[in-house]
Curated annotation (Swiss-Prot):
Cytoplasmic domain ranges by topology: 63-124, 194-197, 243-246, 330-367, 424-433
Organism: Debaryomyces hansenii (strain ATCC 36239 / CBS 767 / BCRC 21394 / JCM 1990 / NBRC 0083 / IGC 2968) (Yeast)
Reported function: Dol-P-Man:Man(5)GlcNAc(2)-PP-Dol alpha-1,3-mannosyltransferase that operates in the biosynthetic pathway of dolichol-linked oligosaccharides, the glycan precursors employed in protein asparagine (N)-glycosylation. The assembly of dolichol-linked oligosaccharides begins on the cytosolic side of the endoplasmic reticulum membrane and finishes in its lumen. The sequential addition of sugars to dolichol pyrophosphate produces dolichol-linked oligosaccharides containing fourteen sugars, including two GlcNAcs, nine mannoses and three glucoses.
Family: Belongs to the glycosyltransferase ALG3 family.
Gene Ontology cellular component annotations, sorted alphabetically: endoplasmic reticulum membrane
Protein name, entry field: Dol-P-Man:Man(5)GlcNAc(2)-PP-Dol alpha-1,3-mannosyltransferase
GO biological-process terms attached to the record: dolichol-linked oligosaccharide biosynthetic process
Pathway linked to the protein: Protein modification; protein glycosylation
């Protein structure tokens, strides 16, 4: 039937009602639930509800496993009794090693669980925390235009992740929800830079810095995001060093406020200095050693090599090298910033208190910016995970929420991404870890990072109105040549 006949009100001709056509419709419907961006809005609320229901089912069916929660509560009770010296705050499994944000969160959990006696209340709270986290993750995902549904399903498929939340009650979960929120705030800042003005973007970036510092005060793994955070924040401040410095200043100020009772900033006597030093030394200890028996990612190296300084320093150098490579080939590429690196440096030195950002910078483009924020923060974090000194089982929560997105950003087929996800999940469910599970885990993370880096279509999409066509590789305008 012609288009004109449809406009005239006539019913379109339907395909014949046959078994083959019915099966074909069913197949297309199922395929759409995985690949049609329109279906993303349908399945998102379903996934959030299922997260909550699965958490409740696991709490009901699977016995709780005590690992560190009792120790956390014991430490909080000592602090609640008035102890400020971190060296004297300890529980069954050791001394307190987390900053003051951890203390404040677990003080609430101490009250909620009636000093640790009502574990079910704590499990329920963590179940809702997981549902909230997935809700926020979906918001972050769907700020990428035409986002397919299949990565959202992956949020339901990690047995280990559900265990970390509702059967272990680790503090890592709170850092994660903070970092997802930071990501959303920066995505919103990128989206509104042109639509709502740079002032709105600056305020959102300030709030993101506040929340980022809170995440660090819960657990220091949030520092893995720092290189990506400062790059994104710099551009969202319009390359204005005054605004950028203000954003960075928020981070230490929040740390001081969070740890006020342990830092004792208005006291300079010997006892106050001792308490202050013990807090800083234990809460922000970068020299902490890890036990080989708990490593998930380096079981394929010998224990002697694992514990050596050579291995530790090698990982640090590798981390820095890969990160620098990503920074110069992707994060601040002229194809994103629309100006060469030399011009970025010159603008920062010549006009530090003015906005020098190129209007075509992809990070402030409403369509491209939110996706690039997710890409930069996600790749920065996973680079840190790949070269981490050691990963323990609860550390999966640090990046599990980003992995489906990163797989999607490789541009690979669903038939490649899903098997990679399944094998990755298997690696985290092998206990104790084996050389094979560790080797596969490291390999998958490296492969995903390479795939994300290699897929230039996601990093350097064609700009609307062909604006990108006027910018060459050096960042200079072709029209000016």
């Amino acid at each position: 039937m012609t288009e004109q006949s449809i406009k005239d009100g006539q019913r379109p001709e339907l395909p014949p009602f046959t078994l083959r056509n019915v099966l074909n419709d069913i197949y297309n419907g199922i395929l759409a639930l995985f690949t049609d961006p329109f279906c993303t809005r349908i399945i998102c609320p379903v996934v959030i509800v299922l997260t909550s229901l699965l958490s409740k089912a696991i709490i009901y069916k699977v016995p709780y496993t005590e690992i560190d929660f009792r120790t956390y509560i014991q430490q909080i009770q000592i602090i609640n009794d008035g102890e400020l010296d971190y060296s004297l705050v300890q529980g069954d499994t050791g001394q307190i090693v987390y900053p003051a944000g951890f203390v404040q969160i677990y003080q609430v959990l101490n009250w909620l669980t009636d000093e640790g006696t009502d574990i079910h209340a704590g499990q329920t709270a963590f179940g809702y925390l997981l549902a909230l986290t997935n809700f926020l993750v979906i918001i972050a995902y769907t700020m990428t235009p035409d986002f397919q549904p299949w990565p959202v399903y992956c949020l339901l498929l990690s047995k280990r992740l559900f265990s970390i939340y509702v059967l272990r009650l680790f503090n890592d979960c709170f850092t994660t929800v903070c970092m997802v929120s930071v990501t959303i705030l920066l995505q919103q800042a990128a989206y509104w830079y042109k639509k709502g003005g740079s002032s709105i973007s600056f305020l959102l970036t300030m709030v993101a810095a506040d929340l980022y510092s809170i995440a660090i005060s819960i657990k220091m793994n949030a520092l893995l995001y720092f290189p990506g955070f400062i790059i994104v924040a710099y551009f969202l401040c319009g390359e204005n060093l005054l605004k950028f410095g203000t954003v960075l200043l928020v981070i230490p100020i929040v740390q001081v406020l969070m740890g006020w009772k342990f830092l004792l900033p208005f006291f300079n006597d010997e006892e106050a200095s001792y308490i202050r030093w013990n807090y800083i030394n234990q809460a922000f200890n970068f020299n902490r050693k890890f036990l080989y028996k708990w490593t998930v990612n380096w079981r394929f190296v010998s224990e002697e090599f694992f514990l050596s300084d050579v291995f530790s320093n090698g990982l640090l150098i590798a981390n820095a090298s890969v990160l620098i490579f990503f920074i110069f080939t992707r994060y601040i590429s002229p194809r994103i910033t629309c100006k060469p690196v030399s011009r970025l440096i010159k603008d920062a030195m010549v006009g530090p208190f003015s906005s020098t950002i190129n209007k075509n910078n992809l990070l402030i483009d409403p369509k491209c910016g939110p996706k690039l924020v997710m890409l930069i923060l996600g790749s920065t974090n996973i680079i840190g995970i790949l070269f981490a000194r050691s990963l323990h089982y609860q550390f999966l929560s640090w990046y599990c929420w980003q992995l489906p997105f990163m797989l999607y950003m490789t541009g690979w087929s669903l038939l490649v991404c899903i098997p990679l996800w399944v094998v990755h999940e298997w690696c985290w469910n092998v206990f104790p870890s084996t050389p094979m599970s560790s080797g596969l885990l490291v390999s998958i993370l490296a492969i995903v990072l390479f795939g994300v880096w290699y897929n230039t279509n996601e990093w350097f999409p064609k700009l609307a109105d062909n604006e990108a066509a006027t910018i060459d590789e050096s960042g200079e305008s072709k029209k000016d040549k």
